[in-house]
Regions:
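Glycine-rich, phosphate-binding/catalytic loops in enzymes
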Residues: 69-73, 136-138
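Class I S-adenosyl-L-methionine
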Residues: 130-175
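Glycine-rich S-adenosyl-L-methionine
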Residues: 72-111
Length: 175
């Protein structure tokens, strides 16, 4: 896989047999206060403020909870027992991964964000189209767009894609 862990493998690839090595993270000491949150972004946005808000939400219907369940288990440091066909733990489904709800999630977040600058990273294959994002951003301030073309990452040689590249967008809002 491409550094995601969506389920237990029926047959192990060579790369899956390597030991997982966890090394301590080194953090730079600073006089500044750092805070980490683990809650719904649209609830949290009503409690925080700042100069710059950088957003990098899921682009598609693939849930982060499923793709990164091993990392979540490591972070939780609990006695999880895999169950079911995939072995995944229960996780909260995100409205950012639902086509019918994602535009409202973004609109609510932008409307309630008490930040001067908002940057949103999103690609051309996401659930939201370029014009949808532009329309939402333009309702709240001055909008700019930057883009960068990237060669598509192919997780395995058997996959076929219509496109060999993707475009990453940086949507910029000055509120």
């Amino acid at each position: 896989t491409a550094s995601v862990y969506g389920a237990f493998l029926k047959t192990l690839k060579k790369s899956a047999t390597k030991p997982i090595v966890l090394e301590p993270a080194f953090f730079e000491y600073s006089k500044n206060q750092h805070v980490v949150f683990n809650e719904d972004s649209n609830q949290l946005i009503q409690e925080v403020e700042g100069d710059i808000l950088y957003l990098d939400p899921p682009y598609n219907a693939r849930e982060y909870g499923a793709n990164y369940h091993i990392l979540n288990t490591i972070a939780l440091y609990d006695d999880f027992t895999p169950r079911g066909k995939t072995g995944l733990r229960e996780y909260e489904k995100s409205n950012w991964c639902k086509k019918a709800k994602v535009a409202n999630e973004l609109e609510t977040l932008i409307r309630n964000a008490n930040f001067e600058w908002i940057f949103l990273s999103y690609n051309n294959e996401g659930l939201l189209g370029l014009e949808q994002i532009r329309a939402i951003f333009e309702r709240y301030g001055i909008y700019q767009l930057k883009s960068q073309k990237y060669q598509r990452f192919k997780a395995d040689s058997n996959r076929t894609h219509k496109q060999d590249s993707t475009i990453e967008y940086l949507h910029i809002l000055h509120k």
